[in-house]
Curated annotation (Swiss-Prot):
GO terms for biological process: translation. It comes from the Bacteria. The keyword Methyltransferase does not apply. This is Large ribosomal subunit protein uL16. Coiled coil: none annotated. Part of the 50S ribosomal subunit. Keywords: Ribonucleoprotein, Ribosomal protein, RNA-binding, rRNA-binding, tRNA-binding. One of its GO terms (cellular component) is cytosolic large ribosomal subunit.
């Protein structure tokens, strides 16, 4: 699963997701992509589940790029613990997604296969997505 090797701070504040994503909003590496059209938080496990689903569909053909990385820690206190006594320990890692962000990209497969694979991967993710193609000028 994806997780950062080192971080500057072990714990972070929650914050909130506002606005659209300008960076990473177009298909840069592959021919087809899966683009977020709603905001949310995607865990490393959800990214891995989507990756496995895509790879099962394309088998040995094609190349996959994961354009998001879970670099933000989510903390959790142990079960049946009283309130207070500080913030809990980091439990898992998330990526914050804003509308417009390209999550996955594919190349080396036909459009029908890519559309099917990315559609199945979208079921594994907690954000609404759409299928996009690379803009060739």
């Amino acid at each position: 699963m994806l997780a950062p090797k080192r971080v500057k701070f072990r714990k972070r504040q929650r914050g909130r997701l506002k606005g659209k994503d300008e960076r990473g909003s177009y298909v840069a590496f592959g021919e087809f992509g899966l683009k977020a059209i709603s905001s949310g938080r995607i865990t490393a496990r959800q990214i891995e589940a989507a990756r496995i689903t895509i790879n099962r569909q394309v088998k040995r053909g094609g190349k996959l790029w994961i354009r998001i990385f879970p670099h933000l820690p989510i903390t959790k206190k142990p079960a049946e613990t009283r309130m207070g006594k500080g913030k809990g320990n980091p439990e898992f890692w998330i990526a914050e997604i804003r509308p417009g962000r390209v999550l996955f990209e594919m190349a080396g497969v036909d459009e029908e296969t890519a559309r099917k694979a990315l559609h199945l991967a979208a079921f594994k993710l907690p954000v609404e997505t759409s299928f996009v193609k690379r803009n060739v000028l």
